[in-house]
Amino acid sequence: MNEEQRKAGTINILAERDRKAEKDYSKYFEQVYQPPSLKEAKKRGKQEVQYNRDFHIDEKYKGMGKGRTFLIKTYGCQMNAHDTEVMAGILNALGYSATSDINEADVILINTCAIRENAENKVFSEIGNLKHLKKERPDCLIGVCGCMSQEESVVNKILKSYQNVDMVFGTHNIHHLPEILEEAYLSKAMVVEVWSKEGDIIENLPKVRDGHIKAWVNIMYGCDKFCTYCIVPFTRGKERSRRPEDIIDEVRELAREGYQEITLLGQNVNSYGKDIEGLDYELGDLLEDISKIDIPRVRFTTSHPWDFTDRMIEVIAKGGNIVPHIHLPVQSGNNQVLKIMGRKYTRESYLDLVSRIKEAIPNVALTTDIIVGYPNETEEQFEETLSLYDDVQFEHAYTYLYSQRDGTPAAKMKDNVPLEVKKERLQRLNKKVGIYSQQAMSQYEGKIVTVLCEGSSKKDENVLAGYTDKNKLVNFKGPRESIGKLVDVKIDEAKQYSLNGTFIQEHQRSMVTQ
């Protein structure tokens, strides 16, 4: 999709701040804004994705931020963290300086998450808390961006109740931040620019990475799976893959800069490459090419079981810098619930995939996501989730109560599992999660593990902390020079969700040759 096509899907809203709240805000939309629609989204056909490698900031915007500061608050997934790095890079290029003091920031951006109702509530609370700041410092700009901005109901709520917000923009037009800022400075009205359809892939965007040890590397955008509970296909758009050469160049540059670990990101990384016409190249091929680059650790997230290929298993099994940790969300252990969720696999096919992974990679650490209390979930169906957990023996799981999201097919289902029942099931599941986590941790007692030291422990400045290749948190006392390096640590104590150990030495590793 080129820029002219993109403009056809652009939404611009100018809402007067002092206008009284009204129930219908459609009059503020210069073009019709379509709310998330499964029917319409599924109609999105294959469109040629344009790759823009010539991103630059117009000279007229440079210096816009001279003498001004910015702060970005980030909610949600790793993709949002990556988007924040890009926005920080653009703001730096405009002359802004970062600050950690929200009371001093001249530009405040709230990068939002729409995956669960609780996340949205936190964001609205945050925006509300900024009302007093806007009164005290009317010249500061407050912006709301990220996935929540792609929802019409959210935009309407901001228009109605949060007139302290100066600008709202979505996930597809971050590279237009200079133009959005300029409009916000010049206008006395709220500026909302939300692209209802995904855009081109923009390369060479500036980034301010969070630290110099680990880095996010986006390999694709969007999702075409349409799980019935998930808003992501609507807020992030259709699947679009970056070109392999662009990804590999970025990873090589990170290796030259001394980064010790990268994580390949996508809403569904297993679909990587499928949308690139004339290219027979999948995630397994990308992993193999990246394994030849001298960077100690390579991770990827998130995987959908339906797309997990034998080629991927083969490459991970070779070892090297591809870590033996696979996050494989199952969501439920019951076939009927999985079908209603639109997950496209069965309990049996999932367990078969796990069996193939474990056979090829005996030392693999498997983790997962599980939703409890999906509409119509019975006690017997939930118990099948518990039994699947026993079968797989995941080393950790992220567990959630079902959260209804407006605009998804599941929102039309009756949320008929009582909250008390949901909480009781979650408690039982988490008890099992703790048991298997303790079991996984206990095997490390007395052993020496390699840890990527990331800094001081959150609980004790005198203790260092880092993660193993299987993503186990390790706390240990050692020299400050260990920060940013791979070190060997002897494990003295295995706790349920972390390990305590003693520093041995800096880890000696062999170079990867291309």
Curated annotation (Swiss-Prot):
Q: Cellular component GO terms, alphabetically?
A: cytosol
Query: What residues bind [4Fe-4S] cluster 1, as annotated?
Result: 77, 113, 147
Give the co-factor note: Binds 2 [4Fe-4S] clusters. One cluster is coordinated with 3 cysteines and an exchangeable S-adenosyl-L-methionine.
Q: EC number(s) in its UniProt entry?
A: 2.8.4.3
Q: Which GO terms describe its molecular function?
A: 4 iron, 4 sulfur cluster binding; metal ion binding; N6-isopentenyladenosine methylthiotransferase activity
Q: Please give the InterPro entries that the UniProt record associates with this protein.
A: Elp3/MiaA/NifB-like_rSAM, Methylthiotransferase, Methylthiotransferase_CS, Methylthiotransferase_N, Methylthiotransferase_N_sf, MiaB_methiolase, rSAM, rSAM_horseshoe
Highest taxon in the source lineage: Bacteria
What role does it play?
A: Catalyzes the methylthiolation of N6-(dimethylallyl)adenosine (i(6)A), leading to the formation of 2-methylthio-N6-(dimethylallyl)adenosine (ms(2)i(6)A) at position 37 in tRNAs that read codons beginning with uridine.
What's the protein name?
A: tRNA-2-methylthio-N(6)-dimethylallyladenosine synthase
